């Protein structure tokens, strides 16, 4: 918090004084492919039902603090019961509560960077130590044996599948090994799971491992990022612990109404998910073709985004914004992601625009260009 006055700086808890305000530097642009949102929006038929549900919702009343009607619907969808489900204000609240309830001074969280930065951030808020098992800088894949070894020495593990921003899946067999190795809890963040190959979810392990926690969100496949609704599937005692530390009324009545309607109409979102998966394959192929003549590398992904490496990534990001009104996420500042940009898979028109812009902006590849080999 470098901008604080000396008076307030002295009042802030010591372990929080070096934190910065989260500012993704969003800029109004013609095309925003920076935040892994679902750029297709909610299907029209589902949107009409959500609007009807919102109109019937009384905002003068406090919400059900446990979102029980929504919990029941989510439980029915996932083949379990309410006791195994907790709802939160987006996945972020549930991630923070996970570290708040089970982390803390003297405890260690194992993660596998590059990955979602909020894991380490919430660990710092709760004074939880972090053990980092870095991915291979070329393949961006995890060192599974090293991660299992770290899990055996940690209190908590968080693994993302598909991983943000690298896009790779955590094999179910690896999750099984982590659950067996870790003396505490293993969370698998499946925020992008709907875009992944069928059968890749680790939910099938929940009955066998009571230390497994699976995180989901309605922000991605359900196009409800602005509503802020996530949920966790876990053993009942884990759910109880998470419920005990949560803020009261954190999921408001409008979010509960919208989420309940969306989950009931979940089949209507399947065509959009299929379209994004199809576009992801098309954009990946187009980027690989572009890499034949431009300095570019791209990694395959199971999410609704692709990670690319280009020379001068920060400048490319700025020129995309300034010259083409296209916003992508610059990760070149992050350890392990030098010269990397993350591009959300959008509509065909949005994807065509970013492909054309990259073809214009990127330098021609030399005969011995090493970036192409990474793709």
Report residues per predicted region.
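Short hydrophobic/aromatic beta-strand micro-patches
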Residues: 233, 307-309, 344-346
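PLP-dependent aminotransferase-like
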Residues: 101-159
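N-terminal "arm"/small-domain region of PLP-dependent enzymes with the aminotransferase-like
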Residues: 1-61, 152-153
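Active-site pre-lysine segment of PLP-dependent enzymes
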Residues: 124, 141-153, 165-186, 190-224, ...
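Conserved PLP-binding catalytic core of the aspartate aminotransferase-like
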Residues: 277, 281, 290-324, 373-375
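PLP-dependent enzyme catalytic core of the Aspartate aminotransferase-like
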Residues: 173, 322-323, 333-375
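PLP-dependent aminotransferase class I/II
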Residues: 43, 211-291, 297-298
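Phosphate-binding glycine-rich loop
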Residues: 68-108, 310, 314
């Amino acid at each position: 918090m470098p901008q604080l006055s000396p008076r307030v700086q002295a009042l802030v808890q010591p372990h929080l004084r070096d934190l910065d305000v989260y500012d993704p530097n969003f800029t109004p642009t013609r095309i925003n492919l920076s935040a892994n949102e679902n750029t297709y929006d909610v299907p029209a038929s589902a949107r009409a039902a959500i609007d009807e549900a919102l109109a019937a919702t009384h905002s003068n009343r406090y919400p059900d603090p446990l979102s029980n009607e929504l919990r029941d619907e989510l439980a029915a969808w996932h083949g379990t019961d309410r006791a195994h489900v907790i709802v939160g204000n987006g996945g972020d609240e549930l991630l923070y509560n996970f570290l708040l309830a089970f982390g803390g001074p003297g405890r260690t969280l194992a993660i596998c960077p590059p990955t979602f930065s909020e894991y380490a951030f919430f660990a710092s808020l709760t004074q939880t130590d972090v053990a980092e098992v870095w991915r291979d800088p070329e393949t961006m894949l995890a060192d599974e044996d090293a991660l299992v070894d770290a899990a055996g020495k940690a209190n908590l593990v968080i693994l993302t599948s598909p991983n943000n921003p690298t896009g790779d899946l955590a094999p179910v067999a690896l999750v099984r090994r982590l659950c067996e190795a870790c003396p505490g809890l293993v969370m698998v963040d499946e925020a992008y799971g709907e875009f992944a190959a069928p059968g890749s979810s680790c939910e099938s392990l929940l009955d066998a491992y009571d230390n497994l926690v699976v995180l989901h969100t309605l922000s991605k496949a359900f196009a409800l990022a602005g509503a802020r609704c996530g949920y966790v599937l876990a053993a009942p005692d884990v759910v109880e612990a998470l419920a005990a530390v949560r803020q009261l009324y954190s999921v408001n009545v409008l979010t509960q109404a919208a989420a309940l309607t969306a989950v009931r109409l979940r089949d209507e979102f399947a065509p959009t998910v299929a379209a994004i998966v199809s576009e992801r394959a098309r954009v990946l192929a187009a980027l690989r073709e572009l890499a034949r003549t431009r300095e570019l590398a791209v990694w395959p992904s199971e999410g609704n985004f692709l990670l690319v490496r280009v020379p001068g990534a920060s400048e490319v990001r700025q020129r995309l914004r300034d010259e083409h009104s296209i916003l992508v996420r610059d990760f070149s500042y992050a350890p392990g992601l030098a010269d990397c940009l993350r591009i959300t898979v959008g509509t065909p028109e949005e994807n065509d625009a970013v492909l054309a812009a990259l073809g214009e902006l990127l330098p021609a590849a030399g005969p011995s260009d090493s970036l192409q080999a990474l793709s």
